[in-house]
Amino acid sequence: MNQLESLKQFTTIVADSGDIELIRHYTPQDTTTNPSLILKATSLSYYQNMLEDVLAYARKQSGNHNAKMRAASDKLAVNIGLEILKIIPGRISTEIDARFSFNSDMCINHAHKIVSLYQEQGINKSRVLIKLASTWEGIKAAEELEKAGINCNLTLIFSFAQARACAEANVYLISPFVGRIYDWYNQRKLLTEDSYDREDPGVKSVHKIYDYYKQHRYQTIVMGASFRKIDQILALAGCDYLTISPVLLEKLRSSYQHVERQLFPATKFFHKPIPLSESQFRWEHNQDAMAVDQLADGIRKFALDQYNIEKILAKKL
């Protein structure tokens, strides 16, 4: 049995890709997308006919050129999601515009728009996860969306405060970014040569979150994300979900080395603490320099990719 199949015994595998052929090849349960992946997908030949359909849809919408451009962007993300849903049994994660990350109302409104576009094509909201950045405003938006029956994937998790606030908001799933945590420490030469497996700071972060969730009986799913190497993935065998890029999925599929479970259900349980207030959340998150840097950087990068998607669409409208 290869490592990918072995890993599936302990963990739900999710593909981090917008490439239909690669997703079909690796048979994941779910798939995650983001503006970076959508931008990359616009250059794939598979999606060229879809682009024409998206532009035709946008031209029929009311409003000025900018409104039509935003409509095209939403429709593109949803249409890519629709194609992916044809070949996976589970859910697609579609991301809210990162520029709304500090406005709960705009996050909520955009989420309802995305869900409506899926529903217009016959897709039940139970097959869609709305991705939001894990700012305080994003978490509060997710809390309201969950109450409305719209499940959310809270992304760009770098601090324990973010993870705790998400659990306390009863969000469906969180995505701690293992590789980007590792990158921050590595770029500052804060790691030794043997900082791997459980000593990897990104891996350690997910272990801490996973154990805390299970010990306090939170139902929020932990999905490790943003991996840089196979060792990070194998060190999280047993995590609820792992979302993995096609390059690393192929490495797992090609290896037949033994996979040993590293994360286990809790054996000790504790009462849930009083939920964090906004000021407590902001203070605790602020105390983690890596998390502050990486959350801000992640939002900026996703916003830039969203802008570039709109730029491509605007030229064609």
Swiss-Prot record:
A molecular function GO annotation: transaldolase activity
Origin superkingdom: Bacteria
PROSITE patterns named in the record: TRANSALDOLASE_2
Pathway(s) the chain acts in: Carbohydrate degradation; pentose phosphate pathway; D-glyceraldehyde 3-phosphate and beta-D-fructose 6-phosphate from D-ribose 5-phosphate and D-xylulose 5-phosphate (non-oxidative stage): step 2/3
Protein's UniProt keywords contain Heme: no
GO CC aspect terms: cytosol
Protein's UniProt keywords contain Transferase: yes
Matching Pfam families: TAL_FSA
Enzyme class: transferase
HAMAP family per the UniProt record, alphabetical: Transaldolase_1 (MF_00492)
Function recorded in the entry: Transaldolase is important for the balance of metabolites in the pentose-phosphate pathway.
Family membership noted in the UniProt record: Belongs to the transaldolase family. Type 1 subfamily.
The protein's assembly and partners: Homodimer.
Name by which UniProt lists this protein: Transaldolase
